[in-house]
Amino acid sequence: MPRPIQAVIHQPALANNLEVVRRQAPASRIWAVVKANAYGHGIRRVFAGLKAADGFGLLDLSEAVLLRDLGWQGPILLLEGIFQAQDVPLLEQYRLTTAVHCEEQLRMLELARPKGPLAIQLKLNTGMNRLGFRPAQYRAAWERARTMSCIGSIVHMTHFSDADSKRGIAHQVEAFEAATANLPGEVSMANSAAVLWHPQAHRNWVRPGIILYGGSPTGVSSDIAETGLQPAMSLHSELIGIQDLQPGDTVGYGSMFTADRAMRVGVVACGYADGYPRHAVGWGERRAPVLVDGVRTQLVGRVSMDMICVDLTPCPKAKVGTPVTLWGHGLPIDDVAAASGTVGYELMCALAPRVPTSVATLTTADAV
């Protein structure tokens, strides 16, 4: 028999979360962002749950080809654009929209001389300072793109650095509007946080990512508690052993946890080789949460490669074989991430290939 650990991808949750975005931005079209293999969920697994989107946004050409192979006929956006001129024919072959964020990418399009017309999203750097033309360069870049015979539609695009924080987006919106004043074309700027909290940024297209998977843009689960978002990934295992500790007994490598009373500790078949965060805290006051048979308890000791240990004090009836939820329904992934010094995004993307993964489909009961 295989180890009892299993991940489940919930297509009904994905469809629900897409509908939440629709309600938040009813006048906008939606790029469903599925980069990084759909934030670790798997493009093949999420496709049915997200195919009501207006388009898909991703990074890799291989992911775009996969979507076409799955039957997607709508728009696909390469969020980082092309990386070499040899990619240009694939834009035509697979009918892809590409971001253009630098002089070099414009030059690639010129040199490749595609038949066109290609749809592009011209990226403006409004303060994130990763990709994009600076405001002083943007209008000239737009004029150049407009005169290129291979380019058809041009969407104005930017990305927010602080939509999930108190600083907000006003300074970036102001820079965007100044740089694009009187330039025709649609606009795409809202990420997940802006979809939820900045309706002035919704415009023609929105680009939700983490909220499609039920995670919080801020990393704080309570910030999205009233939105109706649902976790699209759950990670489950079982107790495979139980130890009865006496006061002074320690648990795990480094003896980081010391029992201050007689207590039962359960051993769970899950470790950092499965994608569970090694830095999850299992001592002190802010220990990582775990559900044992639906009851919330805490990690004890360090995370090992293949195992973790949990406090069974709230679960006196727990025994070998009792189900454990590492994250998912009833236990937000962001809560685990917060106790591990990271964010839910990273935990989603870090799910290990060795973990068996099943899909709760749109046509089956989502009961896992």
Curated annotation (Swiss-Prot):
**Which keywords belong to this entry?**
Isomerase, Pyridoxal phosphate
Q: Which SMART domains match?
A: Ala_racemase_C
- Cite the annotated pathway: Amino-acid biosynthesis; D-alanine biosynthesis; D-alanine from L-alanine: step 1/1
Asked whether the keyword Isomerase is assigned, the reply is: yes
Q: What class of enzyme is it?
A: isomerase
Q: Name one GO cellular component term.
A: cytosol
Task: Name the catalytic site residues.
Answer: 35 (proton acceptor), 253 (proton acceptor)
Q: Which residues bind substrate?
A: 130, 305
Q: Which CDD domains match?
A: PLPDE_III_AR_proteobact
* Listed name of the protein: Alanine racemase
Name its species: Cupriavidus metallidurans (strain ATCC 43123 / DSM 2839 / NBRC 102507 / CH34) (Ralstonia metallidurans)
Q: List the taxonomic lineage.
A: Bacteria, Pseudomonadati, Pseudomonadota, Betaproteobacteria, Burkholderiales
